[in-house]
């Protein structure tokens, strides 16, 4: 939708114009400007205070992070603007069930910190495809998974965040969507390219604090406005729009009436929009893929100074994940109560008048609440929260995607690439991602209402389960080998992509216009499909592995659970093909005298973290000691006990939340 089609709508109705004008006051603008200045200052501080001149420094923050920035960064990387728009929108449409998606993470972060990360640390890996390459050997799995992960980042995570950020920017600022998003991406890319993972984690920590404070304040205002929690539960069930027919068309009652099970997480296994077996089992598969094998998440854990800090960071993230149900999902429901005709509209012409699309306006639930309910200054703070969540998610994706490209793809193309060349390649790939992000904006913008967001939720069900199956078996069953893992991934991908393409071709439809997609393909709920795909992938991996040659234990020490404490030296599969770039580097260091750099070259190197002249070069013995430290998973007994107790408490909190709202 271009600006020409928007202008008649904004002039014909007072509401959008009033929304734009509400934000244009000194208090709101001052808060937004101060926020962006603080974020840039934090990024610059990280740029000057951390070592970004090495791959480990730029991509893993030098493995020196403590628990609280890790926990905050895990949370901020997960909670993007897509959550504020998508979760609140789904809450407005169907109730609290999507909050169960968030609570599933409480269990999975414990699995991440106690099971998966110790294996990754002992393996001495930087990326997830690198782990599979060490575990199985060969190149095809590593390269396949790297490319698939990059595609998932570009066409799900980036597009979801830009789509939801676009909705918010249009509603609140009235800026041209392309101008606003390009400015955001430039600022985001700037401090990610210059600061590396340390800048991302520190800015994530700042943005998590802003998100929580702003959202808690909004929640207080919202519940006060509706008269408390009891009144909220009563009024939501009566939040029916005033216009429910147009012309000679009568809209079915189910399209505008709140669901009877709106305040239940566990819904009917057949008729429920989110069936309870799918939520319990299907969602667990998707959260296993996301929290335990996704580069964005695991990379933050690998930056911790020791395993206790990993576990404590996971626990902090888990406690924070309790909040989205109350701060986001229920806020969408409150928005439906307060602005029923706008948020819950069903008449196409009315919906187009309010939000520019004909199939529904639930996606504007959270932004509308912010613009209409918050006082000056606090409204600016909440806009900052939305921009913070958009930027933190994008920075996480940019940094992790460039890590995947640099470590798993570029090193295969340029086997003798120097450290400096790898750093430059990673930064250039980030610029490429930013370009794709901007090019993707019109595609995202042309998608009707929240349908693209719905697609994205289901895309993970079609592409994630085979990856989760392979990682799970790789860690817990040492008999799995490379052919089994590869064909499990390939078959799972082919089945998943077939369902995805079919659904894209037919469309998901809407309440009034159901999709024509064949029931045998699209009739299976995407969470049930995830379970089926996961089981098929596991069977394929197991059968092919049993019919092919096993991997000797000498190649598996510290790569799987049963051999995690082994002290023997591991001989990597495909050893001898790696680590071939150091000799040429050393030769050039000794043979070629270094020229004195000019002022502008030194400033450029400092800005991009390419100044590698800090301190003497490590000896072979020092490098070996450093490698040993980076693969160390020992913990202080006291802190191990403290994090273990907190882990049990977190699991108990998860069980209580599910039971109370079941």
Curated annotation (Swiss-Prot):
Protein name: Sodium/glucose cotransporter 1
Catalytic activity: D-glucose(out) + 2 Na(+)(out) = D-glucose(in) + 2 Na(+)(in); D-galactose(out) + 2 Na(+)(out) = D-galactose(in) + 2 Na(+)(in)
Illness the protein is tied to: Mutation of Asp-28 is implicated in glucose/galactose malabsorption.
Cytoplasmic side: 48-66, 118-139, 194-202, 296-309, 407-422, 478-481, 548-642
Any Pfam family the entry gives: SSF
Transmembrane portions of the chain: 25-47, 67-90, 96-117, 140-169, 177-193, 203-221, 276-295, 310-331, 376-406, 423-444, 452-477, 482-504, 526-547, 643-660
Annotated function: Electrogenic Na(+)-coupled sugar symporter that actively transports D-glucose or D-galactose at the plasma membrane, with a Na(+) to sugar coupling ratio of 2:1. Transporter activity is driven by a transmembrane Na(+) electrochemical gradient set by the Na(+)/K(+) pump. Has a primary role in the transport of dietary monosaccharides from enterocytes to blood. Responsible for the absorption of D-glucose or D-galactose across the apical brush-border membrane of enterocytes, whereas basolateral exit is provided by GLUT2.
GO BP term, example: myo-inositol transport
Location of this chain's protein in the cell: Apical cell membrane
Cystine connections: 255-511, 255-608, 345-351, 355-361, 517-522
Topology relative to the membrane: Multi-pass membrane protein
Protein encoded by which gene: SLC5A1
Extracellular side: 1-24, 91-95, 170-176, 222-275, 332-375, 445-451, 505-525, 661-662
Residues noted as binding D-glucose in the record, renumbered to the chain: 457
């Amino acid at each position: 939708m271009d600006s020409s089609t928007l202008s008649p709508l904004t002039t014909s109705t007072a509401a959008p114009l009033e929304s734009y004008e509400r934000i244009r006051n000194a208090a709101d603008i001052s808060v937004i400007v101060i926020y962006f200045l603080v974020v840039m200052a934090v990024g610059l501080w990280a740029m000057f205070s951390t070592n970004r001149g090495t791959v480990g420094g730029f991509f893993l923050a030098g493995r020196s992070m403590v628990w609280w920035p890790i926990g905050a960064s895990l949370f901020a990387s997960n909670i993007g603007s897509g959550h504020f728009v998508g979760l609140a929108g789904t809450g407005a449409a169907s109730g609290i069930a999507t909050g169960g998606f968030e609570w599933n993470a409480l269990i999975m972060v414990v699995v991440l910190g106690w099971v998966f990360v110790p294996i990754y640390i002992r393996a001495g890996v930087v990326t997830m495809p690198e782990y599979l390459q060490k575990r199985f050997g060969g190149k095809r799995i590593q390269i396949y998974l790297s490319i698939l992960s990059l595609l998932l980042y570009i066409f799900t995570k980036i597009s979801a965040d830009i789509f939801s950020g676009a909705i918010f920017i249009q509603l609140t600022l009235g800026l041209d969507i392309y101008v606003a998003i390009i400015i955001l991406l430039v600022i985001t890319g700037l401090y990610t390219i210059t600061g590396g993972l340390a800048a991302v984690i520190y800015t994530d920590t700042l943005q998590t604090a802003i998100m929580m404070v702003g959202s808690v304040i909004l929640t207080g205002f919202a519940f006060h406005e509706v008269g408390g929690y009891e009144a909220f539960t009563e009024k939501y069930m009566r939040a029916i729009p005033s216009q429910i027919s147009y012309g000679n068309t009568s809209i079915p009652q189910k399209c505008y009436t709140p669901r009877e099970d709106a305040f239940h997480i566990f819904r009917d296994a057949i008729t429920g929009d989110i069936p309870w077996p799918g939520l319990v089992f299907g969602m667990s598969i998707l959260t296993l893929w996301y929290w335990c094998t996704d580069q964005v998440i695991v990379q933050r854990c690998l930056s911790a100074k020791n395993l206790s800090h990993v576990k404590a960071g996971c626990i902090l993230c888990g406690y924070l994940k309790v909040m989205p149900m109350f701060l986001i999902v229920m806020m969408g429901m409150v928005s439906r109560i307060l602005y029923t005709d706008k948020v819950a509209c069903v008449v196409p012409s009315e919906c187009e008048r309010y939000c520019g699309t004909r199939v529904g306006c639930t996606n504007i639930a959270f932004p509308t609440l912010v613009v209409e309910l918050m006082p000056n200054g606090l409204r600016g703070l909440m806009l900052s929260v939305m921009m913070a969540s958009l930027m933190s998610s994008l920075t996480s994706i940019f940094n992790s995607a460039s890590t995947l490209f640099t470590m798993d793809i570029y090193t295969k193309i340029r086997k003798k690439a120097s450290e400096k060349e790898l750093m430059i390649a990673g930064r250039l790939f980030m610029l490429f991602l930013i370009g794709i992000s901007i090019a993707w904006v019109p595609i995202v913008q042309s998608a009707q209402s929240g349908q693209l967001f719905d697609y994205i939720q289901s895309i993970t069900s079609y592409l994630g389960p085979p990856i989760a199956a392979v990682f799970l078996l790789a860690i817990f069953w040492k008999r799995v080998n490379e052919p089994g893992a590869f064909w499990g991934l390939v078959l799972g991908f082919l089945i998943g992509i077939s369902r995805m393409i079919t659904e894209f071709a037919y469309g998901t439809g809407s309440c009034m216009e159901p999709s024509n997609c064949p029931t045998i393909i699209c009739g299976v709920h995407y969470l049930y499909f995830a379970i089926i795909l996961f089981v098929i992938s596991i069977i394929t991996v197991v059968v092919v592995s049993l019919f092919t040659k096993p991997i000797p234990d000498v190649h598996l020490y510290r790569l799987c659970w049963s051999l995690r404490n082994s002290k023997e030296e591991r001989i990597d599969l495909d050893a001898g093909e790696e680590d071939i770039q150091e000799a040429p580097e050393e030769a050039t260091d000794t043979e070629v005298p270094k020229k004195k750099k000019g002022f502008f070259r030194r400033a450029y190197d400092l800005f991009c973290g390419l100044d590698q002249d800090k301190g003497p070069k490590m000896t072979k013995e020092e490098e070996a000691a450093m490698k040993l430290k980076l693969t160390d998973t020992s913990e202080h007994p006291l802190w191990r006990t403290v994090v273990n107790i907190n882990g049990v408490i977190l699991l108990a909190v998860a069980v209580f939340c599910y039971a109370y709202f079941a």
